[in-house]
């Protein structure tokens, strides 16, 4: 059998479950009204678009999206952008909200979120189940992960990458492996992670992406459901319980393309979210959103092109080293090194620098803004200065991050809340 057909068979026999119910509490007010996977990224996308696009580009066409925390905007986005698949052709993207199938509880953990959907997975008759995190930004060919899983004879395979120990401490599941990448030990979010072989500054961290043989997964979930002391979590409970008696392997994260650096970002803090968006402004960013070989799919709103108006010496509409999305109007203002999402308006004599501006924001005249995140629907009053003095920002009720990024939301401006 050719390698292409072999991979095609593997992906056709796989059901992917994307866990998209998390809040992302380290993002503070930015996730007060939306789940983290519904958060905007890169000018026109939402975070959930990245694992979904990875599935489609990898040939996996049966996908479930598990939702829970403040899921309205996430559900609406998936229905609009991903509802065109045809069930009769064996392809679908289904939304799986917490519905108390097996108990009166909502999803209690990552493993419980899968356990409560066993009947839906079983109906699809997959040979393999892929469980994916829905709150990271990355490009990954899941077909390579599936092939490694099948060829190793594994019961479970955990996708992993090397991260600095200081970054992993308290944040990532960390594993120990042998020469064949068999997992020998696993700790969930240890405060003192064990380092990688031969590299005392790095450790092998779980990406939260797993492949299981289907019946093996069901057996382990049922056992875990009977354990009253379990946290119902893959990293805390399932993986540590199975590594001694079963074949559990690690799969090092690779780029979707040869000779290209692998890209993965955890945008779980205000600083990391801001930084990951700023990286896109590089002439050759690590994440190439313009690569036609691996497109990132999303809901395409019907919007007019961006417009730049006025060309006077003291009133010139322009954007430099920036991403400016559809429906934006830069009216006699200057935008530098910033990411502007859909339908942002920046009015005359204002300056926006080094900022991430989410959809439907209006910056009125004579404003100066830098190193900021402006949440959706903000209306910045005329003459307001943001990002130049952190004490003044805090006095206005804005949040300033550890690295000096100022977050502004509608609530902080005294506007009606509930924008998603």
From Swiss-Prot:
This is Glucose-1-phosphate adenylyltransferase. Belongs to the bacterial/plant glucose-1-phosphate adenylyltransferase family. Homotetramer. GO terms for molecular function: ATP binding; glucose-1-phosphate adenylyltransferase activity. Involved in the biosynthesis of ADP-glucose, a building block required for the elongation reactions to produce glycogen. Catalyzes the reaction between ATP and alpha-D-glucose 1-phosphate (G1P) to produce pyrophosphate and ADP-Glc. It catalyses: alpha-D-glucose 1-phosphate + ATP + H(+) = ADP-alpha-D-glucose + diphosphate. Pathway: Glycan biosynthesis; glycogen biosynthesis. Pfam families: Hexapep_GlmU, NTP_transferase. Alpha-D-glucose 1-phosphate binds at residues 107, 173, 188-189, 206. The gene is glgC. Keywords: ATP-binding, Carbohydrate metabolism, Glycogen biosynthesis, Glycogen metabolism, Nucleotide-binding, Nucleotidyltransferase, Transferase.
